[in-house]
Amino acid sequence: MHPQVLIAGAGPTGLTLALDLARRDIPVRIIDQATEFFPGSRGDGIQPRTLEVFEDLGVLDAVLTAGSPTPVMRAYFGGEFAGQRRMADPVEPTPAIPYPNLWVLGQSRTEAILRDRRPHCPAAASSSSQRR
């Protein structure tokens, strides 16, 4: 199967696009300038709408298992404890908004989950991933 789409960038956006196209039987090829996968993180927050996309792609369970809700933060003023709270108050899901809260998961782990899903999508699995 020859790729019909070339995706520049093997980060979360490129991998998400590859999975979405592959499930539509559109073969892709992903290229990336990096020579290896970045082990750190450039972004840890996954937005609610992205969680909906991940559900649609079949990776949501892995993302929810690997990540966590936003952590509690503590504030200190003049060396004294002033209080603690979450970055945002949790919101209850509704049928219209099933995932209303930010989810915390490092980018390298998100990328690994998306890469692990590629073998389940023949059009993505048959494409080549070139890293230079």
Where are these regions (language model features)?
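N-proximal short alpha-helices
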Residues: 23-27, 36, 83-87, 91
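A conserved short coil-to-beta-strand element within the FAD-binding core of flavoproteins
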Residues: 128-132
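A short helix-to-beta-strand connector/capping loop
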Residues: 118-126
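Conserved beta-strand scaffold positions in the cores of enzyme catalytic domains, especially
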Residues: 30, 102, 126-127
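N-terminal Rossmann-like FAD-binding beta1-loop-alpha1 element of flavoenzymes
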Residues: 2-30, 35
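Active-site-adjacent segment of FAD-dependent monooxygenases/related oxidoreductases
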Residues: 42-119
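Residue-level detector of anion-binding/catalytic polar loops
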Residues: 27, 60, 124
